[in-house]
């Protein structure tokens, strides 16, 4: 049957080619109704050139005709009347056509099957665009559709069997009434004369015996029909359960997992349309079978016959009710999750959807959905069916919404657009747990009436865990909790259990996913970047990523304990990197201009043999979200320089590209790319001269130690090329600084740009004032500009 199911999905020219294969010699209706039988016969085993195989071909012809006749006999009622005549006609037609040449039937069917398979194969390989299968699904998805076709045919078959049972029972009841009428006639015989009474009595007795014999035999037949029908329903329910398990426990759970990973920056979870179509097919077939079972129960009540059927029917009825209950409750899902970091007094949205809403007439009486926030412990109690009514952990405004049915898309959903968490009630914290580690969830509840109020279901679904914050400063640590939960939560967990330790490669995958999403870049974390992060986290020196693969990272290491020697956690440092890139440096990161994940020693090793003026940009160790410039310039004191880190605050004043453009002695971006080639397109255009006669001041980046170098470089572009040849200094010299520290260098020998920028801003303010109006009291301290060695252009 699988071949015919695939053939039915052909389109365009391929479909037309398939239709040409059929005609009076072999009607397409025969192929359709006997698909399973035809595909299970050994057509290829017959040698068309061997007369000895004629007998086997004749048997196949006879089998085909018998199957058609049997199929015709099973068609009952008004719907089946025309089909019954057609199938009977086709049986006679094929018998007459191939009776004398059964080998031609074999040749015909082999030709049809071969070309069907060819068309399907070509469509799957996309060799003929017009004949492409609609569905480019995976093999598993194809199997799901094949199972649906099998369920559809089985349900059709049980419907025919039920109608046959009903007609047989109705005729039985008529004959039973005739038996009662005969029984009544015996009572009237006393009014007749003896001779006539005897003659009449004998005839009635013969008729009664014959009828009772028929009734006994027919009662057994009816009972057999009932048992066979129930057994078929039992098999149908087994297949339904299996199909429902695949869709709800595999495909839907996989979609939910994708939704969870999307919260960490993974690919979008995808449309629900395919899942909804499967769930709707399930609902339709389940409901049809349930109605058939109820009609069978009614027939048994109408004509009770001792036996096991009533008990069997009660069992299958209970089973199918359980199946539909599981379907309805499992397909009430959250299509759009609420924010997982939820700030109080802030508007947020969410969308819930019922995937079977259009098929079970739920939309005829639109249900209302209510949203509440509950704690992790309350969620655990809820799943244990413990009484938690009205036990909430906060108050959500605008938390009720009526589900709406959208005719065009066939979706039943509720859109919460203006919810707001008014207040939150926190639980007692455990040990070192902070408020940003406490998890809550939004509970959505409703009541659905199915099938004209035949069944009523209480449905509930929980959102992904949310962390509630009251201030923006808590956002970073709350995001860490969400990241860890989304990445490492296991299917079917108790809310909201998550491993306390994970392997380093698992964390690498989560960090890379988050990094690419936050920075909005296809340039993720390289192997070298991950080695740097591992060294930072584990305080190890190995440069081989494989050495860290078996190492575990605990939640405490990730975002509870500070890194050794620093006043921040691993996550806080990494999050700072993402934030500064996201806000200011996405294009530079995508261009490969920011090396980023290197420390001072690594920067020294990379630059030491490069020409003077070669520089690289790396993420600061001492400043969260800081970026520093390391560059090569040979001088009597040292040959490697590190500028004090810039932060988001600095880049909001002047961009990285403009700052680099100000420093003329920075010539090559590591390893050897000309600076202007990389950054010129990001320089701020020079403003035109003011028309009011005033000269507009500018803030420019200046490094005091290199003021002269800047001036010379401005006059002579080859200044850096004329500098002394680089000398490879020992590492001890790399860490040594002049004995008299410069007043604008910090204790690590890095330039204090905050002071430099403050001076520049002060000078700009002075230049904007008329000279004769300056108050001497506002003049800067004597020697300030000299000591700072700043320059203003």
Curated annotation (Swiss-Prot):
The keyword Zinc-finger does not apply. The modification Phosphotyrosine is found at residues 90, 682, 694. GO terms for molecular function: DNA binding; DNA-binding transcription activator activity, RNA polymerase II-specific; DNA-binding transcription factor activity; DNA-binding transcription factor activity, RNA polymerase II-specific; DNA-binding transcription factor binding; double-stranded DNA binding; phosphate ion binding; RNA polymerase II cis-regulatory region sequence-specific DNA binding. It is found in: Cytoplasm; Nucleus. CDD domains: SH2_STAT5a, STAT5_CCD, STAT5_DBD. ISGylated. Tyrosine phosphorylated in response to KITLG/SCF, IL2, IL3, IL7, IL15, CSF2/GMCSF, GH1, PRL, EPO and THPO. Activated KIT promotes phosphorylation on tyrosine residues and subsequent translocation to the nucleus. Tyrosine phosphorylated in response to constitutively activated FGFR1, FGFR2, FGFR3 and FGFR4. Tyrosine phosphorylation is required for DNA-binding activity and dimerization. Serine phosphorylation is also required for maximal transcriptional activity. Expressed in heart, lung, and weakly in muscle. SMART domains: SH2, STAT_int. Residues 772-793 are annotated as: Disordered. It holds the Pfam family SH2. One of its GO terms (biological process) is positive regulation of mast cell proliferation. The modification Phosphoserine is found at residues 128, 779. Keywords: Activator, Cytoplasm, DNA-binding, Lactation, Nucleus, Phosphoprotein, SH2 domain, Transcription, Transcription regulation, Ubl conjugation. InterPro entries: p53-like_TF_DNA-bd_sf, SH2, SH2_dom_sf, STAT, STAT5_CCD, STAT5a/5b_DBD, STAT_linker, STAT_N_sf. Gene3D superfamilies: EF-hand, SH2 domain, STAT transcription factor, all-alpha domain, STAT transcription factor, DNA-binding domain, STAT transcription factor, N-terminal domain. It comes from the Eukaryota. Residues 589-686 form the SH2 domain. GO terms for cellular component: cytoplasm; cytosol; nucleus; RNA polymerase II transcription regulator complex. Forms a homodimer or a heterodimer with a related family member. Binds NR3C1. Interacts with NCOA1 and SOCS7. Interacts with ERBB4. Interacts with EBF4. Belongs to the transcription factor STAT family. Carries out a dual function: signal transduction and activation of transcription. Mediates cellular responses to the cytokine KITLG/SCF and other growth factors. May mediate cellular responses to activated FGFR1, FGFR2, FGFR3 and FGFR4. Binds to the GAS element and activates PRL-induced transcription. Regulates the expression of milk proteins during lactation. This is Signal transducer and activator of transcription 5A. It comes from Rattus norvegicus (Rat). The gene is Stat5a.
């Amino acid at each position: 049957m699988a071949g015919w199911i695939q053939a039915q999905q052909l389109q365009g020219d391929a479909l037309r080619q398939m239709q040409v294969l059929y005609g009076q010699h072999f009607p397409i209706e025969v192929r359709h109704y006997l698909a399973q039988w035809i595909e299970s016969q050994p057509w290829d085993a017959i040698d068309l050139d061997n007369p000895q195989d004629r007998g086997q071909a004749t048997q196949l012809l006879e089998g085909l005709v018998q199957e058609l006749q049997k199929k015709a006999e099973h068609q009952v009622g008004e719907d089946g009347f025309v089909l019954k005549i057609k199938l009977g006609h086709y049986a006679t037609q094929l018998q007459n056509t191939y009776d004398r040449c059964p080998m031609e039937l074999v040749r015909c069917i082999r030709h049809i099957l071969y070309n069907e398979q060819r068309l399907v194969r070509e469509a799957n390989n996309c060799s003929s665009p017009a004949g492409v299968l609609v569905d480019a699904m995976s093999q598993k998805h194809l199997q799901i559709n094949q199972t649906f076709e099998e369920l559809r045919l089985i349900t059709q078959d049980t419907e025919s069997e039920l109608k046959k049972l009903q007609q047989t029972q109705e005729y039985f009841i008529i004959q039973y009434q005739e038996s009662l009428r005969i029984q009544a006639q015996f009572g009237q015989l006393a009014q007749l004369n003896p001779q006539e009474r005897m003659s009449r009595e004998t005839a009635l007795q013969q008729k009664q015996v014959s009828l009772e014999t028929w009734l006994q035999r027919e009662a057994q037949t009816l009972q057999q029909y009932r048992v066979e029908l129930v057994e078929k329903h039992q098999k149908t329910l087994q297949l339904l359960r299996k199909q429902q398990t695949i869709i709800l426990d595999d495909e839907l759970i996989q979609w939910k997992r994708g939704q969870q990973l999307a919260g960490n920056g993974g690919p979008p979870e995808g449309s629900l349309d395919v899942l909804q179509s499967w769930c709707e097919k399930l609902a339709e077939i389940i409901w049809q079978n349930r109605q058939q079972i109820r009609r069978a129960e009614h027939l048994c009540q109408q004509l009770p016959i001792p036996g096991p059927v009533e008990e069997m029917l009660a069992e299958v009825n209970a089973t199918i009710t359980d199946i539909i209950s599981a379907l309805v409750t499992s397909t009430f899902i959250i299509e759009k999750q609420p924010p997982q970091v939820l700030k109080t007094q802030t508007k947020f949205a969410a969308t819930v959807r019922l995937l079977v809403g259009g098929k079970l007439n739920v939309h005829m009486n639109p249900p209302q959905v209510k949203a509440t926030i509950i704690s992790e412990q309350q969620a655990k109690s809820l799943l244990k069916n413990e009484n938690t009514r009205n036990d909430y952990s906060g108050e959500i405004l605008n938390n009720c919404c009526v589900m709406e049915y959208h005719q065009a898309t066939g979706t039943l959903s509720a859109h919460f657009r203006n919810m707001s968490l008014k207040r939150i009630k926190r639980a007692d914290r455990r040990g070192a747990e902070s408020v940003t580690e406490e998890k809550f969830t939004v509970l959505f509840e409703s009541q659905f009436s199915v099938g004209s109020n035949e069944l009523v279901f209480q449905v509930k679904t929980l959102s992904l865990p949310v962390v509630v914050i009251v201030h923006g400063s808590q956002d970073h640590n709350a995001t860490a909790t969400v990241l860890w939960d989304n990445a490492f939560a296991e299917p079917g967990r108790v809310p909201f259990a998550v491993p306390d330790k994970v392997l380093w490669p698992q964390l690498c995958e989560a960090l890379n996913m988050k990094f690419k999403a936050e920075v909005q870049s296809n340039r993720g974390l390289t192997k070298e970047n991950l080695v740097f992060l591992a060294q930072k986290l584990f305080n190890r020196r190995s440069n081989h990523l494989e050495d860290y693969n078996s190492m575990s990272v605990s939640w405490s290491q990730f975002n509870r304990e500070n890194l050794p020697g620093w006043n921040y956690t691993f996550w806080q440092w990494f999050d700072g990197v993402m934030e500064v890139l996201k806000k200011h440096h996405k294009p530079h990161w995508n261009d490969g201009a920011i090396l980023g994940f290197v420390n001072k020693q690594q920067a020294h090793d990379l630059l030491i043999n490069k020409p003077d003026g070669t520089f690289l940009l790396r993420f600061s160790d001492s400043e969260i979200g800081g970026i520093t410039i390391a560059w090569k310039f040979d001088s009597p004191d040292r040959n490697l320089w590190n500028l004090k880190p810039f932060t988001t605050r600095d880049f909001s004043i002047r961009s990285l590209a403009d700052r680099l453009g100000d420093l003329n002695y920075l010539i090559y971006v590591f390893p050897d790319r000309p600076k202007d080639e990389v950054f010129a397109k990001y320089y701020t255009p020079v403003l035109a001269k003011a028309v009011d006669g005033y000269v507009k001041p500018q803030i420019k980046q200046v490094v005091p130690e290199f003021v002269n170098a800047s001036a010379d470089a401005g006059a002579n572009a080859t200044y850096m090329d004329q500098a002394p040849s680089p000398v490879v200094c020992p590492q001890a010299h790399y860490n040594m600084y002049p004995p008299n520290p410069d007043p604008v260098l910090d204790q690590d020998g890095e330039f204090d740009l905050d002071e430099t920028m403050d001076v520049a801003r002060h000078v700009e303010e002075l230049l904007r004032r008329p000279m004769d109006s300056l108050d001497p009291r506002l003049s800067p301290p004597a020697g300030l500009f000299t000591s700072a060695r700043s320059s203003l252009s």
